[in-house]
Amino acid sequence: MKPVYIIQRRKSKQVFVGDVAIGGDAPISVQSMTNTETTDVKATVAQIQAIQNAGADLVRVSVPTIDAAEAFKIIKKQVNIPLISDIHFDYKIALKVAEYGADCLRINPGNIGREDRIREVVAAAIDHNIPIRIGVNAGSLEKDLQKKYTEPTPEAMVESAFRQIDILDKLNFDNFKISLKASEIFMTVFAYQQLASQIDNPLHLGITEAGSLRFGTIKSSIGLGLLLSEGIGDTIRISLASDPVDEVRVGFDILKSLNLRSKGVNLIACPSCSRQKFDVIKIVNELESRLEGITAPIDVAVIGCVVNGPGEAKAVSVGLIGGEPNLLYLDGKTHSKITNENLVNELEAQVRNRLKSP
């Protein structure tokens, strides 16, 4: 089925985090962040690998101390995905991790300090040919901006970003991306809209401290959905109080829903009602669990009755319609009858077979 609407993305410059392009005509990348103690090398490496296996393009690692920087050096050698170092307060840590192989340096304008410190961070980024992310957060704005605006506002966040941009411009450094994050949806959206109209550097999107898996997913989907639908955004991170792997899955689901990036199974399912001829909810949950590891794009429909079933099944690669009997559709055409006892096994087999077909 052809999309009704194709989002026209904002034109932006391109930077590279490791071998991952961000901005320009590159796909919108999905990233997450470790929540282990960085000094626990084994646990951090394991979590990075889990995030990577979930499909993430990039991983951010907090580096709060020199000891964590030393651990980062070891971690970097044990993984094969670009790592972004998250730096707050101590600019000297940024200098260390740049030397140790960081693929990008995230600095917070609210706490990184004076211009001379930023100059040193930029010099390190130039020496090692890595980008910087200017990561503005509503909760940690510069003290004078807090006093000027009395509370976080989109305008305060944009002003914070431009202070850093002006410094980087003076240094002829253009290898950077920017984020403007708040936990309030419209503050975040308005800040990004203002900034996006004034610069062409790539933008990292996120609703910070969005909350639990359920509510954080809802907030992030609304906030990022508004921006992405306007073509704003080049890389995303879904901030959830949950397993980082969940962040990756939600991120790709948002992009998939907007037809911005296809990855994994797009599972279409009815909410079920008394007309259903099999337990739709049970079948969908089990099928989704079994197909979770698939990264190749494929559309699958599970519809419990014949009201909308035929129309949905004709538009996907694998479709199931509840009836007497149930019908299996492949590539929009009726393929076979299928009993309730074997629904999940048959659907899983057909999905995997379709992905193997040339």
Swiss-Prot record:
Binds 1 [4Fe-4S] cluster. It holds the Pfam family GcpE. It comes from the Bacteria. GO terms for molecular function: 4 iron, 4 sulfur cluster binding; 4-hydroxy-3-methylbut-2-en-1-yl diphosphate synthase activity (ferredoxin); 4-hydroxy-3-methylbut-2-enyl-diphosphate synthase activity (flavodoxin); iron ion binding. [4Fe-4S] cluster binds at residues 270, 273, 305, 312. It is an enzyme of class 1 (oxidoreductase). Keywords: 4Fe-4S, Iron, Iron-sulfur, Isoprene biosynthesis, Metal-binding, Oxidoreductase. Pathway: Isoprenoid biosynthesis; isopentenyl diphosphate biosynthesis via DXP pathway; isopentenyl diphosphate from 1-deoxy-D-xylulose 5-phosphate: step 5/6. Its EC number is 1.17.7.3. One of its GO terms (biological process) is terpenoid biosynthetic process. Its cofactor is [4Fe-4S] cluster. PANTHER family: 4-HYDROXY-3-METHYLBUT-2-EN-1-YL DIPHOSPHATE SYNTHASE, 4-HYDROXY-3-METHYLBUT-2-EN-1-YL DIPHOSPHATE SYNTHASE (FERREDOXIN), CHLOROPLASTIC. Converts 2C-methyl-D-erythritol 2,4-cyclodiphosphate (ME-2,4cPP) into 1-hydroxy-2-methyl-2-(E)-butenyl 4-diphosphate. Belongs to the IspG family. This is 4-hydroxy-3-methylbut-2-en-1-yl diphosphate synthase (flavodoxin). The lineage of its organism: Bacteria, Pseudomonadati, Pseudomonadota, Gammaproteobacteria, Candidatus Pseudothioglobaceae.
